[in-house]
Each structure stands twice: as C-alpha cells, then as structure tokens.
Swiss-Prot record:
This is Dihydroorotase. GO terms for cellular component: cytoplasm. Zn(2+) 2 binds at D148, H175, H228. Pathway: Pyrimidine metabolism; UMP biosynthesis via de novo pathway; (S)-dihydroorotate from bicarbonate: step 3/3. GO terms for biological process: 'de novo' UMP biosynthetic process; purine nucleobase catabolic process. It comes from Lactobacillus delbrueckii subsp. bulgaricus (strain ATCC BAA-365 / Lb-18). Keywords: Hydrolase, Metal-binding, Pyrimidine biosynthesis, Zinc. Its cofactor is Zn(2+). Catalyzes the reversible cyclization of carbamoyl aspartate to dihydroorotate. Substrate binds at H58, Y59, R60, N90, N274, H305, F319, G320. It catalyses: (S)-dihydroorotate + H2O = N-carbamoyl-L-aspartate + H(+). The active site is at D301. Binds 2 Zn(2+) ions per subunit. The gene is pyrC.
Amino acid sequence: MQTVIKNGTVYQNGRLIHADVLIEDQKIKAIGTDLTGDKVIDATGKLVSPGLVDVHVHYRDPGQTYKEDIETGSKAAAHGGFTTVGAMPNVTPVPDTPDLMKKMVQENKQKGIVHIFQYGPITKNETTDELPDYAALKKAGAFALSNDGHGVQTAQTMYLAMQEAKKNDLIVAAHAQDDSLFNHGIVNEGEKAKELNLPPVTELAETTQIARDLLLAEKTGVHYHICHVSTKTSVELVRIAKACGINVTCEAAPHHLLLTEDDIPKDNGYYKMNPPLRSKEDQVALLVGLLDGTIDLIATDHAPHAKQEKQGGMQNAAFGITGSETAFSTLYTKFVKEDKVFTLEQLLSWLSDQPAKVFGLKKAGVLEPGCPADVAIFDLEHETELKEKNYQSKGINTPFTGQKIYGATVMTMVDGEVVYQRGEK
C-alpha cells in the first residue's frame, strides 16, 4: 500500500518546500508535487519533518520502571515527534557485558515504538575505574559509550577509555562533572543559591573536566562528545578546541536554552536538574554557540521521575527533567515564533539531521527517497496548552506544564506506521 502525505511544508536538505511525501514498503518512495497514493494524509498548513533524533534519553528500564520504562519512554518520544533516540546505560543492571547489552538491545526493539540505539558504559557499572570490553559491547549492539549521570573521576581512567574507544571507533559521550567540585551542590553558584539557602554548584565542576578531557581527546584522537554543556566557559573551551582541530562535538539541552536560575520561582523540585539552570550570561552563550556551530545539536536529557521524588523542595528532590514531549514545541514557540533568535530550518537541523550526522546514524533524521519512512507532522499555526493528562511518559516532572505553545505534534510515523496521532492516548 502507498501512503501519501499531501500539501505539507516539508523540511528536506536544510530547506522548507511545499511538497507531498509518498511512502511505500516502510520507506520514502518520492518527494514532489501531485503525488498520489492508496491512503492520503492531509498535511495542509502543517510542517512535515524527518522524525526527530534525540541522542540523550533515560528510560530507567530495567531497575526503576516506576519512573519510566521502554514502552512509555518511546511513546513519549513519539508524542514529541522523535523517531530515533539514544538510551543511556544508567539502568540496573548496567549493560556492561555482551550478554547484558544483547538483552538490552533486544528489549529496546521488542518494547519500543521508536528506533532505540543503546549506549554502553565507559566503565563497568558506571562507577568503577575498570573498563568493559568495548569491542564485545559494540558487537553486541552498543552504538556509543557514556557514563551519563556520572563523570569519569580519574584522568587515567578516561585516558585509557579514550584509547580503547578510538581503537573500536566508538564515541565517548561524557557527563562532565568533577564530583569533588560538585560537592553535593543543588543550584548554580550565585544569588539564587543564597536566596534559597541551598548548596551551590560551581561551574568549575563542569569546565575543569571538559578542559581535562579535551586534552585527552587531542592526544588520543577519539571522537569526544560532551553531554548537556551549560556554561559560557564550556562553550568557549569547545570553540577553542574545534579551532585547534580536536575531534569534539557537544549538545545543549532545551531547559538550559529556555530557562535560567532566575526562572526558579521558589524551592521547587521541578527546577532541580544536573547540570543546574545557569545564569543569563550562560544561556546567551549557549544560544550563540548553537548559532556559530560550536554546539552541534540539541538533546533533551529526558529524565523522568515519580511525582513524589520531585516534591518537598529541592534539597531532597531527584535531579532531572523530562523533555521528549516538550522539546520541539517549547523551543519553536520561544526562539522561532516569538523571539526570532533562529529559524525553523536551524531548529529542525539541530533536532534531526545534525544529531544523526554526529553519531553516524545513517538514514535517520532525513527525508530522502530510499530512507526509512520516519516522519513527524507538526501544527505550527494553532496554540495549545501543555497538560499533564496528555503526557505519554510516566514522568510529569517538567516546569513547562501549563505553558501555551505552538508546534504540537499531529502525527509521528516510524517505518511508515503511525505510532502517535493527536487525540489518541
């Protein structure tokens, strides 16, 4: 059967064009005008995009499925227009052996409704200095390495990890955090920490480890990717490193682009995340970094928690914010429609073809004949409200609930099959 998406504004090759998209046998067959098919999806007035790509999600499965599981996490991704995600390995047990990795990959495929690529850990159990067998993990299905949630604390361990990752052509995606400097902090070091009387987090906890790792990456030649950069100095370090030819890429999270520490209204656990919300100066630096190419992509760091884990104030709340279901719409509304900081084409690139390119996910994040029919359709014209009852994730831990947005997802397709349709829970 042939399905045609008619009369949409299609994002293809960095441009927006008025076109139809023809789908057959799970693939894009053609993009053009006056195309016909057995089934017609009317996209008049809608944006037709490649399925978005999020290289940073936490599905808590196995081990903490009361927070999220593969099924609900992938449904949340589809609700946000994402058709490809990278799942972090901070689950229980950590997939640090070939058997555990194979099982994880199999579970992702069986339970997920989007394409789920699985990270392996940089170190065994994510908390030791012992390296797993990277070659075996890659053969079992790992597409990259990360200890996200934990910084690799010793330079020697990271140096050895980068050497082995380079040998096996694996990306090292680092959560840059020096625990001795983080020192059980909660909010960014500044006036807000003083106002709330909460332990501060110095930016040095992030920047010193980035500086260390950039030197190690230069020495080893590994592809070093930095998760959720959040400070002006971090951006400057990456900018200098790229100018020096170091093989480094990095991502920014939607919440660090949209919010600052000044937006924390009170001691509210929904605003507790790691890295913490930073200063206005840091926020501006992130936006400039995206626009000048220092920051390569946007990734959500979707980190769901049970409702009770985010209540009772920031001191005892868990770190983390959801993002899969709110990323595109909140970013589009704020930075494209309202403030005109960047274009729709730029936003779509940072959320689709760029993450796919950086991580070597061939045929993801693009609409081209012969590629998988992974498609997202968005409504840019009508205002809607973000409501808890509409979330597909088990986690409702986002401060964006109640916000009026444009860019709601109308439909998401994976391999030509509809996996999300607005109005259907």
